[in-house]
């Protein structure tokens, strides 16, 4: 969470005028792992690209900063073919088009980005010869792509980088964020003997300090924390005054009863 959000709060006089603040709580109970900035992740992506000829990456399709880190890490190191699907390429085109004031931050060259087509044998041949960096999503479409690509990828030359919230693939008991389909999607790489790297995702989630500052500055009537472990105590990080405003299950406002489920 950058300092820009606080400038927006001041500019539009948001503080004290918000009924409900919905905020994440990913790092509420994170007392051990540090939050890595994107430039550190970028360096680690470079090391992965240098070590493995074929790199698959699962990440958010709309996280512009993460996409920039991955794209630039490849461009500044091994310069392998950068492979996406048409949806992801459209997202990158939108970022490139509308981030006119952020040209120093985003450096996507759309002409260098390849949209994968399983029917184009020339693309598969290029990927076999030069290796690749390919962005994935957990879907039937991408599963069909993998069934075509993985058989000719040597396991010792192939890596999957999981760059999303780890809770989605953490199979521990009581983890309500666990996603079986995503877990199976990731595990197929291990079953083939490929290396799976899961620790390149910490930025993009606000620290406890930022969450406290945000709640204090916005000063809403109700605070609803989402995207957190079930046992994480969001209210415990706030002052007594704000703690009383945290609603995780149900609340009433202006005669309306609202129940919160699976947030």
Q: What residue ranges belong to the model's regions?
A:
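Positively charged, amphipathic N-terminal segments that serve as targeting/anchoring signals
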Residues: 45, 49, 63, 77, ...
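His/Asp/Glu-rich metal-coordinating catalytic cores
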Residues: 1-65, 69-76, 81-83, 99-102
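C-terminal regulatory/interaction regions
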Residues: 72, 76-77, 111-263
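Structural recognition of alpha->loop->beta junctions
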Residues: 11-17, 99-113, 194-198
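Short internal beta-strands
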Residues: 22, 81-90, 160-164, 224-226
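Hydrophobic transmembrane alpha-helix bundles
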Residues: 60-66, 91-103, 217, 232-246
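Generic secondary-structure transition motif, activating predominantly at the C-termini of alpha-helices
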Residues: 16, 49, 53, 96-99, ...
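Active-site environment of divalent metal-dependent phosphoester hydrolases
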Residues: 1, 27-32, 59-67, 87-92, ...
């Amino acid at each position: 969470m950058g300092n820009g959000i606080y400038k927006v709060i001041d500019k539009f006089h948001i503080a004290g005028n918000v009924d409900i603040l919905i905020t994440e709580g990913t790092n509420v109970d994170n007392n051990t792992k540090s939050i890595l900035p994107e430039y550190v992740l970028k360096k680690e992506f470079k090391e992965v690209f240098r070590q493995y000829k074929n790199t698959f990456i699962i990440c958010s399709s709309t996280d512009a900063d993460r996409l920039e880190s991955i794209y630039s890490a490849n461009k500044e190191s091994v310069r392998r073919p950068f492979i996406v699907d048409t949806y992801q390429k459209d997202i990158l085109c939108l970022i490139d088009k509308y981030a006119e004031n952020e040209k120093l931050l985003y450096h996507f060259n759309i002409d260098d980005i390849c949209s994968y087509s399983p029917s184009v044998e020339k693309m598969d041949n290029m990927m076999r010869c030069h290796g690749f960096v390919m962005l994935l999503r957990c879907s039937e479409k991408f599963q069909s792509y993998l069934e075509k690509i993985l058989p000719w990828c040597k396991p010792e030359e192939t890596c999957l980088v999981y760059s999303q919230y780890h809770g989605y693939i953490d199979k521990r008991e009581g983890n309500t964020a666990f996603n079986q389909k995503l877990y199976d999607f990731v595990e197929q790489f291990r079953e083939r003997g490929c290396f799976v790297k899961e620790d390149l995702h910490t930025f993009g989630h606000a620290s406890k300090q930022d969450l406290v500052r945000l709640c204090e500055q916005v000063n809403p009537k109700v605070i609803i924390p989402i995207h957190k472990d079930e046992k994480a105590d969001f209210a415990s990080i706030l002052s007594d005054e704000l703690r009383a405003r945290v609603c995780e299950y149900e609340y009433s406002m202006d005669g309306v009863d609202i129940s919160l489920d699976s947030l």
